[in-house]
């Protein structure tokens, strides 16, 4: 993953040097997970415990025109859930499992603005948008030892996830953009929660839940970005 990150940094640095219409900034918010442990609320920032369900990251965006932009984003998140939390199904409460995990995610995607969003205009700009792409993420491998309620780490792994983002952004000042977005990620893992560890661990572990669907993680938050690069030049013929 380190080599991929370096290559992407070189690519976007080159893109920035020879072009314009760039944004760079930060993303902060809450995270929640959807899987085989705890409640199944789809969007629930901070999920009862801010210390284990938060996300922060950096974002780079290249605006191709008023409707389309490319994005690269790196996030670090903590996720967790418990069968003892409110709104959990009764059969899960009787089981009493809980876990914590961490995610390092690199995302590449394309944004589509529903309205024209002119980054050069001095007037207020705003638009809803959607985004999708692909993410590479690293997470802790977890398992539940037989008869133990808390998941324990036994390694780490790298996998893919497929994000769908909806958001709303505003440009209140010439060089700053604020966006509110919800980013739902369908992961290629069924073990973010420790419910389905590797074959070697299953003999000495409690495993449970459905293998028909993978785990999801959701980031909900705010981005603050700064516009940089040369403005359009309207030259006389």
Predicted feature residues:
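Residues that define the transmembrane beta-barrel architecture of outer-membrane proteins
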Residues: 20, 50-54, 102-106, 126, ...
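Short glycine/proline- and aromatic-enriched beta-strand/turn motifs that initiate or cap beta-hairpins
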Residues: 19-61, 219-232
């Amino acid at each position: 993953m380190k080599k991929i990150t370096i290559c992407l940094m070189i690519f976007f640095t080159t893109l920035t040097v020879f072009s314009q219409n760039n944004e760079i900034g930060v993303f902060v918010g809450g995270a929640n997970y959807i899987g085989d442990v705890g409640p199944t609320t789809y969007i629930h920032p901070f999920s009862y415990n801010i210390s284990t369900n938060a996300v922060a990251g950096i974002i780079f965006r290249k605006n191709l025109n008023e409707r389309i932009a490319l994005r690269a984003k790196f996030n670090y998140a903590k996720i967790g859930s418990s069968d003892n939390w409110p709104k959990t199904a009764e059969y899960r409460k009787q089981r009493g499992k809980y876990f914590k995990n961490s995610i390092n995610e690199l995302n590449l995607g394309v944004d589509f603005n529903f309205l024209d969003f002119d980054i050069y205009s001095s007037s207020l700009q705003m638009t809803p948008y959607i985004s999708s792409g692909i993410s590479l993420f690293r997470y802790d491998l977890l398992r539940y030892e037989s008869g133990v309620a808390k998941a324990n780490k036994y390694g780490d792994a790298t996998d893919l996830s497929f994000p769908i983002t909806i958001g709303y952004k505003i440009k209140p000042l010439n060089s700053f953009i604020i966006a509110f977005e919800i980013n739902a990620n369908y992961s290629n893992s069924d073990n973010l929660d420790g419910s389905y560890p590797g074959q070697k661990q299953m003999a000495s572990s409690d495993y449970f839940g459905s293998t028909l669907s993978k785990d999801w993680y959701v980031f909900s938050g705010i981005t603050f970005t700064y516009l940089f690069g040369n403005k359009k030049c309207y030259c006389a013929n």
